[in-house]
Amino acid sequence: MRAADTLQASLREVVGEANVLTDPDATAGFLVDWTGAYRGEADAVARPRTTDEVSAVVRICSGAGARICVQGGNTGLVGGSVPPARRDPERPTILLSASRMTDIDEVDVIGRCVGAQAGATVAAIDARAAQAGLAFPIDLASRESATAGGVVSTNAGGTRMIRRGNTRSQVLGIEAVLADGRGLRRWTSLIKDNVGYDLPGLLAGSEGTLAVVTRVLFRLVVPPASAVVAVAAVDHVQTAIDLIGAASSQGLTVEAAELMTEAGIALVHEHGQRRPTASRAPFYVLLEVSGPGDIEAATAELLSGTDGLADAVLEPAPARALWGARESHTESIARSSATPVVKLDISVPIRALPEAFAELAGVGDSGDFDCRPVLFGHVGDGNIHVNLLDVPVERAGDVTDTVFGIVSAHGGSISAEHGIGRAKARWTHLGRSDVDLDAMRAIKSALDPHWLLNPGVIFG
């Protein structure tokens, strides 16, 4: 009997016959990311239901020397949620899916927190919080499919980061399974708990390379009593930055700040999304603000005093139609490229944002690359999502080199919130020194000495 067959039989004893998938038709959806750019191979897909089952699955795989790839909602954009492209003939590969781990606890209203299994979606967690009059501080365009385990593993930022911080800031406690199958539980609603290392913080952003996250205790927040959403058509990136600063100076709380371009708005309009403003401009800034008193009047006054503004529209939150212009970018971009979109998630210091944005938008004009750049992102924290359409497949690495060169020249990061995954593993040296990388490898080796968890992710 093949080693993979023996392994599959052992896994079936833990999670049941129906939850160990080996038929190619059944496993196909787990082995390709949603963009279609990354495809992998696995000897089986295991779907545990509880932390104990995850522990048993990992213990079996560890004993067999099998590689374990962890997957939540499979909405990642850097290839970290699918297995390596080729099987290792010496070691089986198991994809561990959290798709059955969707439980969400009752909300602790006094402690303002809620526990959720790794497969619970962002939207479901927020809905549970809303039942208690609270809100989940993480919000993403992929909220209906992105999962608790996924946002923790990538330390996702999202549209509310300017107000609430990244995912790591929202994690109070965590349950995880180490590479040898032992369970790690750091579960407390204490705001102050300074005993030793911050292991939940370490696992946030580790992309499944240090442990398998199974449950998370998230912080919840009180939603603003009143908020409005404005989309302003502006002449320059600096105008958008100044608008955010002016909002804060006038006593408004900036809940979200998103930047779009005319190229992006035209693209989403082609795919059925209405234009947010009647007038066109090079840039569009979406601003969601809250505050006391007549928030609409205060926001209207803010906009009226902005130089370089061609047009603006204002609606009470949640203003889904206005948000739709921003949130439909990713899907519209994916449907508009003749080749897999080169998707890069970068950040630069806000002071460098106007110049860096112009250089990145000009990548397709240099003559070196025949591509269409579409840029958008979180202007309030310097995060730009660079999307390069119609790049010849053989030039994807070259154009990525160019983009990352621009980012490095401005003192930026090659990964703002999507993680490194497989897509950026060859470029990690641009963001970390040799000593830094050695320290990261030492941590990896300490927690996963045989390097079984998510092979190829972060370190290549």
For the regions a protein language model found, what residue spans apply to each?
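Noncatalytic alpha-helical scaffold of FAD-dependent oxidoreductases
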Residues: 1-460
